Structure formats: C-alpha cells, structure tokens
C-alpha cells in the first residue's frame, strides 16, 4: 500500500530526504475515518514516514539493501490532514549502522507541523 506520491528532495550530505503525499478524497479510508469529516489516520502518516525512511536507506546507504520498518518512537500528532491536501514528510537520518537506521521525521501540511516521530528501520 503505497503511502508516498513521490520524493522531492534528497540531501546526501545531511542524510535528509523529503517526500510528498497527495491526500485525495477517493482514498480507501475517507468514507469510514470519521464519516462526514475525513481525517488522514495517524497510522498512515507514520507509514508514509516509514516508507520514506526505507527509500532513504536504499538511496543514502546503498550497500544496506531493503530497509524494513522496525520501530516507531516518540510519535506526536499536532494537527490534522484533511483531503484534498498535500502532506510533506521530512526524514533526517540520525543514527546509521550495519544493523539499523534511525531517522527523525516530521510531517507538514499547509505550513503546519502535523506529526513528528522517530522511525527505526532494519535490513530485511
């Protein structure tokens, strides 16, 4: 289940990537995740961040292979994402080893911070 529309920026020097997710009214969750007032579920925001971290691991650390989701820590939700809108996800690698990557992630929608978390990934 693809949760990113694309990657818009890669900064190899600072181990940072920015992804974009276009949130539309025809997504599978819209009808049921708060009827009459659709809100992008927090778990899908986290999944967007995890997918971006997997991409970042492959691009920024090529010999690491595929990075799978291992853990999410310190998740905080500070706003809502209502379709139609665009969610930007930023991931900065803060710890990289052969066994794992750790990234600090943020989601921004309409210029507002809507979530932040720390994602850990591991080669699978």
Indicate where each model-derived feature is located.
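Hydrophobic residues on conserved beta-strands that form the core of alpha/beta folds
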Residues: 4-5, 69-72, 102, 116
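Compact, glycine-rich, soluble single-domain proteins
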Residues: 31-56, 69
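Catalytic strand-loop segment that frames the active site of acyl-thioester-processing enzymes
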Residues: 1-40
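Hydrophobic beta-strand-centered segment that forms part of the acyl-chain substrate-binding groove
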Residues: 50-90, 114, 122
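Residue-level detector of beta-strand structural context in well-folded domains
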Residues: 5-8, 73, 79, 105
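Generic structural detector for well-ordered beta-strands
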Residues: 8, 20-22, 76, 92, ...
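HotDog/MaoC-like acyl-thioester-processing domains
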Residues: 12-16, 80-124
